[in-house]
Amino acid sequence: FMSSFLTELKSKRVLILGGGVTGKSLRKYLEIHAHSVVVVDEQKNQSGEISVLTDDILSRIDIAIVSPGWRRDHPFVDMLRKSNIPILSEIDFAWQVKSEIAPEQRWIGLTGTNGKTTTIQMVASIFEHGEINGTACGNVGETVIDAVTHQPPFDFLALELSSFQLEWSDKARYEAGALLNIAEDHIDWHGSFDSYGKAKLKLLEVSKVAIVNGDDDNAMAVVRSLNPEKIIAFTLNTPSSGSVGLVENLLVDRAFIGDGDAEVLSELSDIKPAVPHNVANALAAAALCRAIGISSEKVQRGIKNFTLD
């Protein structure tokens, strides 16, 4: 019999790194469910927030939760490590809460350099127009902890994940994860292109189905280490069996149905704008939804009704 994470949390003194949207959400939850909570933010602006971490404060902290975007080499993070205080990402914290209060809820995740927000909004449109009890959260929609604690619980959460968040997270597991593309943009934070790729790969390693851009050499290089059985590629070319792609003016699924069969996911003309990168986004969104059993009819309806903000 494992002791409950939430039961243990009641006696924990929690430090939140970051007083932004995520930090505020976490604080609201922890003020009820933890022993005590303190927020550290260098741009201290709320009451009850501190801007500097001192040894005195560290001596009264049991666990730390880090908001997105905090670097691993930040001095505060270093202090926490030296004090042997466990550090959780907000994703892993929310996952542990979910595991107790909504054990049936399933997560899908999405990462990539460009197009994440549009793609996750397409997924949200498929949920909405297919009457799926799910929501998009993280960088779009509500925070992950708010989505997890929503009553009644959602069946599905679709998370837009940055490399920052993936690098910090070890516990969360996904029904499906998608890698849209990899451009060399966040190298400063990760230190090298290699570690940036590794952060992206982390999502696919902990996903049952790994959806990846078959037209992106960087992305395909990153997934070489994965079990090929679980990889589903999306492509702007004609899809082979086990992939999703384009056949003339149709988006077609040859991955989530019987061998040799194909189903239409969307008409090209229903994607607005039907420019290549946006068609790729639609294929990724469709594949994520097909991976959790959403019908191609519902996918089609969601894409048709989606317009860019």
What function would you assign to each model-found segment?
Residues 1-96, 294-297, 305-309:
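N-terminal leader/targeting and accessory segments in enzymes
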Residues 19, 42, 112-113, 139, ...:
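Cofactor-binding loop segments of dinucleotide-utilizing enzymes, especially the Rossmann-like FAD-
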Residues 44, 92, 141, 171, ...:
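Residues that form or immediately flank small-molecule/cofactor binding pockets and catalytic motifs
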Residues 5-12, 17-19, 190-194, 229-309:
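Adenine nucleotide phosphate-binding catalytic loops in nucleotide-utilizing enzymes
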Residues 22, 67, 162-163, 235:
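Short linear Ser/Thr-Pro motifs
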Residues 13, 28-31, 55-59, 68-214, ...:
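Phosphate-binding loop of NTP-binding sites
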Residues 62, 101-109, 243-253:
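Short, surface-exposed amphipathic charged segments that create phosphate/polyanion-binding patches used
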Residues 1, 153, 238-239:
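Residues that act as N-cap/strand-start positions at coil-to-secondary-structure junctions
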